[in-house]
Swiss-Prot record:
It comes from Bacillus subtilis (strain 168). Probable N-acetyltransferase. Its EC number is 2.3.1.-. Pfam families: Acetyltransf_1 (PF00583). This is Uncharacterized N-acetyltransferase YvbK. GO terms for molecular function: acyltransferase activity, transferring groups other than amino-acyl groups. InterPro entries: Acyl_CoA_acyltransferase, GNAT_dom. Residues 6-155 form the N-acetyltransferase domain. CoA binds at residues 69-71, 77-82, 111-117. CDD domains: NAT_SF.
Length: 155
């Protein structure tokens, strides 16, 4: 099967379609707005269709974090998520980072698999992160999302 290659570019503006994607990965608009102000938002296009998004944020000297990454639901399971992760890794290298980090929920089974397949390793678990930072309970894959699983990749 020939996988379509995404066109990934620095996002110029934030609109409802982009917010819908960002909110797939993070249900808090306030938190999304906060890291959009501080990070760089990259949009991914399959032809003329917005297919995905990720946000890179410099968190410490020599370290960047993918603070949000999402693929449009109708386009998931087509390898686009992997393209986004690999693009973020390349961008981090070009920024001179030594480490790239990402965090996801304990219930995000597919994401945990993807990140490890891309070379990330589990670094830590922030217990009850989602209970402390989100007003609404989050459920995914029939599991309550409670803990943040932190992963890293040395570049």
């Amino acid at each position: 099967m020939n996988m379509q290659k995404l066109r990934i570019e620095l996002g110029e503006e934030t609109n409802d379609e982009l917010y819908d994607l960002l909110l797939l990965a993070d249900p808090s608009k306030d938190i999304v707005d906060e890291y959009l102000e501080r990070g760089e938002c990259y949009t991914a296009w399959a032809g003329d269709e917005l297919a995905g998004v990720y946000v890179l944020l410099k968190t410490r000297p020599q370290t960047v974090e993918i603070v949000n990454i999402a693929v449009k639901e109708s386009l998931q399971k087509k390898g686009f998520g992997k393209q986004l992760v690999l693009d973020a890794i390349e961008k981090a290298k070009k920024l001179g980072a030594d480490t790239i980090e990402i965090g996801t929920g304990n219930s995000s089974i597919h994401q945990l698999s993807l990140y490890q397949k891309c070379g990330f390793r589990i670094q830590a678990i922030d217990h009850d992160f989602f209970l402390r930072h989100y007003d609404e309970d989050i459920f995914e894959n029939g599991i309550q999302c409670r803990d943040m699983v932190r992963l890293y990749l040395d570049l």
